[in-house]
Amino acid sequence: MPKQKPHILLLSVGLVLLFGFTACVMAKTYIAYSKQLNRMAVIQTAFENMAFCRPYELSSEGFCLSPTTVLTDAEGKKSPLSEVVSAHGRTLVYRFSRMNCLPCIVMHFKLLKSILDDRAQMGLIILCDYHNARDLRILRNTYEVSCGLYSVDRLGIPIEDVNNPYFFILTQDMRCEGFFTAFKETSQQTENFLRALLEKL
């Protein structure tokens, strides 16, 4: 019997190590599963938000902006909207507010910079509601904005009630079309949308 004690000890140590390894694997699996569930929940919420925004996008289609709408640039210069739209007939507009989701705005600026070349940026304007020219300059320098960046009050478009950043096309006759409400959780959909819009500019 005494000779069996080392075997029992080794077996006990082996069982402890096995249980420890199993517990570690199960814990890691649970953490990974929980993260996946959280990610899926976030994406589901984003798509639910997109579905909620869709009626506002549709009701904004065809909305005509006033060509005399006053825009203010980072130097404090004021210009009517008709003077800043693309001479090529269509302008891609990115509109956001100070009250919008900051991570969304950061992601959108990075996305615009990564997929728009110099030619495409000439057909882009960014509209926000920073009424202080200094804040506009900080924004321009922070995100290295090379396209038109302007401050403007509410445009009166239904989609503004959603309180989320959005993109749309502005035609030369001031008609709005192709609205898309963008969320940071759906960056791939936003990129696909922007690439499709670029073909129309």
Model-derived features: where do they sit?
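Short, Lys/Arg-rich N-terminal segment immediately upstream of the first membrane anchor
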Residues: 1-8
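Hydrophobic membrane-insertion alpha-helices, especially the h-region
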Residues: 10-29
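N-terminal "domain-start" segment that seeds a small globular fold
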Residues: 34-84
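Short active-site neighborhood of thiol/selenol oxidoreductases, capturing the structured segment around
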Residues: 76-115, 122
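Short acidic, S/G/P-rich loop/turn micro-motifs used as interaction or catalytic elements
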Residues: 98-104, 131-133, 182-185
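Structural microenvironment flanking redox-active thiols in thiol-disulfide oxidoreductases
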Residues: 105-142
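Short, internal strand/loop/helix patches
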Residues: 137-170
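Thiol-/selenol-based redox modules, centered on thioredoxin-like
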Residues: 169-201
